[in-house]
Swiss-Prot record:
The keyword Amino-acid biosynthesis does not apply. This is UPF0319 protein VS_II0881. Keywords: Signal. Disulfide bonds: none annotated. It comes from the Bacteria. Belongs to the UPF0319 family. The keyword Signal applies. InterPro entries: UPF0319. Residues 1-21 form the signal peptide.
Amino acid sequence: MKTIQSIALLSAIVAAPSVLADVEIQVPSSVDILAVNEAKPDLDGGLFSSHKTLTLPDGQNQIVFQYQLAFDKGNDREFVDSDAVIATFDATDTTLTFDLPKYRNTAEAKSGFKNLEWSLVDENQNEISVKQDKLVKDGMQIGRKYPQEAKEYNQQGGIAALAIGTTAGATAAVVQPVTLPAKIDGNAANTAEEMLYFWYEKADAETKQKFKDYVNK
């Protein structure tokens, strides 16, 4: 019976990661996410959607973004971009949205972008704590490699640097390895045991540790 329960627990964790808690950021079309936790961003949403969704793990995360606006000027459109902002924050199991200033024209935007005032707010419209800085690079701006720039920024210990040991949005957990037979003895293993080994091998280190804790109860 314990084996069957173990299979159910392990397979549920491995096969359905979407049930785990995470943080979602609703990203408006005026915000360009340039890097996430020293990596290229992966957002959900169509090319012409009014907003996209960025899903992050619970805990400390870092984003790099630009606020981009366009204004009518006669028959033309004039575009204004903010400096790249690098920001680090802690959040758990919530949905966040950007709270950004609005400007009536190009002049207002250029002036406001010199010291951009923005925030992230949760589902209750409470502003969360954010450490932020400008990710500045001299010279040519085209072709910038923002994930690499964020990594170098963190190594230098900037105001909005990720905590030491934090990469890809999650702090690596130190776990003790679980010792299991490398190969199942076909004469001894029943179907339940085979399923148990199958799901165990598919699990990541964190899930294996959770499973070990459960089995040892």
